[in-house]
């Protein structure tokens, strides 16, 4: 299981942008099997500009390596179809979660309104959250040829250092649950955390803070899936 810590605003912006892109109606409703290779020219280019240009600088390269580049051509069509099916399965199993397709991957957002949440200043997985993570682990078992990036966030209440540690512990708790309790391979998971530095809502309101206390999961095709898709496409 790989973990890394990066606090720069640039990387935080990358994940904020992922969520922002995913919440656009056009991105949410588009079928990636139909789009095929052209997805690389849209949001993939944005992610490449933010993350890819900083490979090797302050650890950002590892984050970029986890997300990877968009696979184009016929292989991209095949991968898009598989990831579409996985995203649909997750939506069916966990209707409360926010599930969006971004490039070749899937971004899931769990906050206090979607079943996976933490008590104030706590990072243990409660029984209600376990039930949701159990459903997601079943989907991850059904689709084994993916890697998973788990990202923790907090609201702005409390000291910056405390929130950074708290977001780290929460993200690692989710990863540990998948690996230690559900038996998923640790090699599939990378854990990251941003404390309060990447909010998606207004921290001055109770509703906004609840949305910012969240965990994101980015599910991306692994090299096995990519290589098989290239072989099937004759590329």
Predicted regions and their residues:
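Bacterial N-terminal signal peptides that target proteins for export
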Residues: 1-12
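C-terminal motif of bacterial Sec signal peptides marking the signal peptidase cleavage site
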Residues: 19-23
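Short, low-complexity, glycine-enriched hydrophobic/amphipathic alpha-helices that associate
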Residues: 26-88
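Extracytoplasmic/secreted proteins, especially bacterial periplasmic and envelope-associated proteins
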Residues: 37, 42-46, 50, 65-66, ...
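Amphipathic, membrane-active segments
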Residues: 83-114
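Short, solvent-exposed beta-strand/turn patches at coil↔beta or beta↔helix junctions
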Residues: 102-134, 154-161
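Periplasmic peptidoglycan-binding/anchoring modules of Gram-negative envelope and division proteins
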Residues: 118-151, 175, 210-212, 217, ...
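Periplasmic OmpA-like peptidoglycan-binding domain that tethers envelope proteins to the cell wall
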Residues: 153-228
């Amino acid at each position: 299981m790989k973990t890394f810590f990066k606090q720069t605003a640039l990387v935080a912006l990358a994940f904020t942008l992922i969520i922002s892109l995913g919440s656009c109606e056009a991105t949410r409703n588009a079928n990636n099997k139909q789009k095929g290779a052209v997805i690389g020219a849209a949001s993939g280019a944005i992610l490449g500009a933010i993350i890819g240009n900083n490979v090797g600088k302050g650890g950002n390269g590892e984050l970029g390596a986890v997300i990877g580049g968009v696979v184009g051509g016929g292989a991209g069509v095949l991968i898009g179809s598989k990831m579409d099916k996985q995203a649909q399965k997750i939506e069916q199993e966990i209707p409360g979660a926010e599930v969006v397709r971004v490039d070749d991957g899937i971004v899931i957002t769990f906050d206090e309104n979607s079943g996976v949440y933490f008590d104030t200043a706590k990072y243990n997985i409660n029984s209600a959250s376990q039930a949701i993570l159990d459903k997601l682990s079943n989907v991850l078992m059904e689709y084994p040829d993916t890697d998973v990036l788990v990202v923790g966030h907090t609201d702005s209440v409390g000291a910056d250092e405390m929130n950074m540690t708290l977001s780290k512990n929460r993200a690692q708790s989710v990863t540990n649950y998948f690996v230690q309790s559900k038996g998923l391979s640790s090699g599939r998971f990378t854990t990251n955390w941003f404390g309060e530095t990447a909010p998606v809502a207004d921290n001055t309101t109770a509703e906004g803070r609840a949305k910012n206390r969240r965990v994101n999961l980015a599910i991306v095709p692994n090299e096995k899936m990519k290589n098989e898709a290239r072989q099937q496409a004759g590329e």
